[in-house]
Amino acid sequence: MAVFKTLTDADMAIFSAGLVAGVDEVGRGPLVGDVVTAAVILDPNRPIAGLNDSKKLTEKRREALFDEICEKALSYHVGRATPSEIDELNILHATMLAMQRAVAGLARTPELVLVDGNRSPAFTHQGLSLTSHSIVKGDGLIASISAASIIAKVTRDREMDALDAAYPQYGFAKHKGYPTKAHFDAIAEHGVFDQYRKSFKPVKALLER
């Protein structure tokens, strides 16, 4: 299938394919917190300049685009899977579940779902089965996936900032829950709490000591 690098080209796809939802995830690698996904249906009549893979944008730019996406999108929804669901299902299946929840929560029914990466779960919306495709590095190629990556990234980063306020000794505002040396040092000193993913090897090893 064609890959569209600009919003103008994506608009053309929307006109031919109907409503297109972009889906992306953030937070598969961290040791703590939910895996967060987002689904976004952009409005071709209200283009958003500067959409890109959220990891390639500054925090200030992501925050500005987050607000613009929320204002201009036809629909968007955040889906998540909790640490307990990640431990029960494994991170891959929990991520697929979170993506399904994001699409199911959209206020509009998309005719096509485009997912960043090389895997796509089966999507339904209000009882209807949806066509979906996965696109490797789609968050840098497809406007709606870029928008979804920004919504998911800003949402999860804000949650890590809130967790940092509650547990400042762990440094979540800096490492966002990822397995850095500073994070390992913090959990070695302070232990883990209920939002940690207990099936992840570093956490599991600590609990088994």
From Swiss-Prot:
Primary residence: cytoplasm
Gene3D superfamilies for the chain: Ribonuclease H-like superfamily/Ribonuclease H
Chain positions recorded as a divalent metal cation binding sites: 24-25, 116
Cofactor: Mn(2+); Mg(2+)
UniProt keyword annotation of Transmembrane helix present: no
GO molecular function: manganese ion binding; RNA binding; RNA-DNA hybrid ribonuclease activity
Location in or out of the cell: Cytoplasm
One example of a Gene Ontology biological process annotation: mismatch repair
Co-factor note (free text): Manganese or magnesium. Binds 1 divalent metal ion per monomer in the absence of substrate. May bind a second metal ion after substrate binding.
InterPro entries associated with the record: RNase_HII (IPR022898), RNase_HII/HIII (IPR001352), RNase_HII/HIII_dom (IPR024567), RNaseH-like_sf (IPR012337), RNaseH_sf (IPR036397)
Pfam family, one: RNase_HII
RNase H type-2 domain segment(s): 18-209
Listed EC numbers: 3.1.26.4
Domain of life: Bacteria
Gene Ontology, cellular component aspect: cytoplasm; ribonuclease H2 complex
Reactions performed catalytically: Endonucleolytic cleavage to 5'-phosphomonoester
Sorted UniProt keywords: Cytoplasm, Endonuclease, Hydrolase, Manganese, Metal-binding, Nuclease
Family: Belongs to the RNase HII family.
Function of the molecule: Endonuclease that specifically degrades the RNA of RNA-DNA hybrids.
Alphabetized HAMAP family for the sequence: RNase_HII_B
Protein name listed in UniProt: Ribonuclease HII
Gene: rnhB
